[in-house]
């Protein structure tokens, strides 16, 4: 299996949860697979564990990825480390497919010179946000990180520590006053692709906003968005 190539114009492509169309999402294998391809960046999701570790996983529990009714934030990292995740065929035959850490993710992105698109999934405290920042600072890689979140307060906390840091608010549809709010808070946008057209993208650009969109997996839609000038496309399989 290979990625789907498309004419991306000047749009930058982000591998969603790593190259999750080919490898199990949010694993080191998915991050390395994306690292070995032409992606500009690699997106992942961060949760905290019961003992305060930062791990990369999308869901709040392990039902979908491992068939286990375990909530990520209610167990220590040592418990999560022992669990093998499903591969793309639904089996557990690969010992390497395990829950990774923020530290591992940053290391892989840095090795392959990929931009980090880091979704803050939990509702983090200021102290936890600072902990995440310090892990990235330890790799000297903050300049290559964009924070994203559906939780607006997470992004405000990022901006309190790092006023000039790249950060994008995730949302599914426009609401009254949203554009004005993100401009005031010096954020950019990461929006569901279905609400975008050329007029909307132009409006956002005219307001000085960087436009990321998710999750685009067909060649036709990817090329349409690229022709309209969207800045980033987040995809499971397009390259």
What are these regions (language model features)?
Residues 1-239:
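Phosphate-group recognition and catalysis centered on beta-loop-alpha active-site segments
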């Amino acid at each position: 299996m290979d990625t789907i190539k498309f004419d991306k114009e000047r749009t930058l492509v982000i591998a969603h949860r790593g190259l999750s169309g080919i490898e199990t999402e949010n694993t080191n294998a998915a991050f390395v697979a994306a690292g070995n391809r032409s992606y500009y960046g690699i997106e992942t999701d961060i949760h905290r564990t019961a003992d305060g570790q930062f791990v990369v996983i999308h869901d709040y529990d392990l039902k979908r990825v491992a068939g286990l009714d375990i909530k990520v934030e209610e167990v220590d990292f040592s418990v999560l480390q022992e669990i093998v995740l499903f591969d793309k065929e639904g089996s557990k035959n690969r010992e390497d497919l395990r829950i990774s850490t923020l530290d591992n993710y940053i290391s892989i992105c840095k090795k392959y010179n990929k931009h980090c698109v880091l979704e803050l999934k939990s509702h983090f405290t200021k102290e936890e946000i600072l902990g995440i920042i310090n892990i990235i600072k330890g790799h000297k890689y903050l300049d290559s990180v964009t924070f994203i979140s559906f939780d607006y307060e997470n992004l405000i906390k990022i901006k309190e520590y790092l006023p000039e840091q790249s950060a994008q608010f995730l949302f599914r549809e426009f609401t009254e006053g949203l554009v004005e709010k993100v401009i005031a808070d010096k954020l950019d946008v990461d929006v569901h692709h279905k609400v975008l057209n050329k007029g909307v993208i132009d409006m956002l650009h005219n307001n000085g906003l960087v436009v990321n969109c998710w999750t685009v997996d067909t060649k036709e839609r990817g090329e349409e968005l690229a022709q309209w000038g969207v800045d980033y496309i987040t995809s499971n399989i397009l390259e």
